[in-house]
């Protein structure tokens, strides 16, 4: 029978103490927090459409997704490659949004009104986690820093694009807007995760002693919870 050693016991006590600080959310609280998350995503999408360099970078990313998709041998780990493919798959040449990606890349490169550019970005239906990853990738091209696994993967992939992306400078107000939206998104997503983390521990406890370590189960469950928090849309009920 599997037992926990003293170090695992200590780790669990710390985790349980942290979890107790975050009660389950009411429906209204969840709605408010999720609303902040999606407002931040919308703000990033608007910046993509409004700023020439960001618009061009998004167009380049779409073109490369269609013509130069990421190959596993180009990445330091299979996990990083999988992370990016999972996000980009709809925009590959055989993906269900391939035609939208083609049209979007073309529209974003054209001189047009801000409304047309914003519609082109909206039509792409970029998921929250990919929107954030692209934003962090763009921020890094401009000399900024922010932690994000999807952006890490895009960075590795971009070294093998048809034409490697060049760095660019962003106006201070643009940098401020991007950083603010990233911070607000991360805070909202993390709040959804922390307030639901006790559910992960509860489910993991049911499988305790079945050949997989409890802490490993918690880790896997937490990763799944983060993914769910990124996708969750309160307005749709899932």
Task: Name the predicted role of every residue range.
Residues 1-9:
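Charged, compositionally biased N-terminal leader segments and the immediate start
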Residues 8-238:
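Alpha-helical promoter-recognition and RNA polymerase-docking modules of transcription initiation factors
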């Amino acid at each position: 029978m599997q037992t926990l050693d003293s170090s695992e016991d200590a780790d669990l006590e710390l985790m349980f103490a942290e979890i107790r600080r975050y009660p389950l959310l009411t429906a209204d609280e969840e709605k408010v927090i999720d609303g902040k998350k999606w407002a931040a995503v919308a703000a990033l999408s608007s910046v993509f459409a409004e700023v020439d360099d960001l618009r061009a970078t998004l167009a380049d990313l779409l073109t490369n997704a269609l013509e130069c998709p990421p190959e596993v041998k180009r990445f330091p780990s299979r996990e990083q490659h999988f992370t990016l493919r999972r996000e980009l798959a709809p925009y590959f040449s055989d993906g269900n949004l391939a035609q939208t990606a083609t049209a979007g890349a073309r529209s974003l490169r054209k001189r047009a009104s801000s409304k047309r550019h914003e519609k082109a970005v909206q039509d792409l239906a970029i998921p929250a986690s990919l929107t954030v990853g692209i934003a962090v990738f763009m921020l890094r091209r401009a000399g900024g820093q922010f932690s994000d696994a999807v952006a890490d993967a895009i960075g590795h992939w971009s070294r093998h694009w048809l034409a490697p992306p060049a760095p660019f400078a962003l106006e201070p107000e643009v940098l401020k807007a991007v950083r603010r939206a990233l911070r607000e998104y991360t805070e909202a997503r993390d709040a959804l995760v922390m307030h639901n983390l006790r559910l992960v521990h509860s489910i993991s406890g049911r499988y305790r002693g079945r050949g997989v370590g409890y802490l490993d189960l918690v880790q896997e469950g937490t990763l799944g919870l983060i993914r769910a928090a990124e996708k969750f849309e309160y307005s749709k009920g899932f």
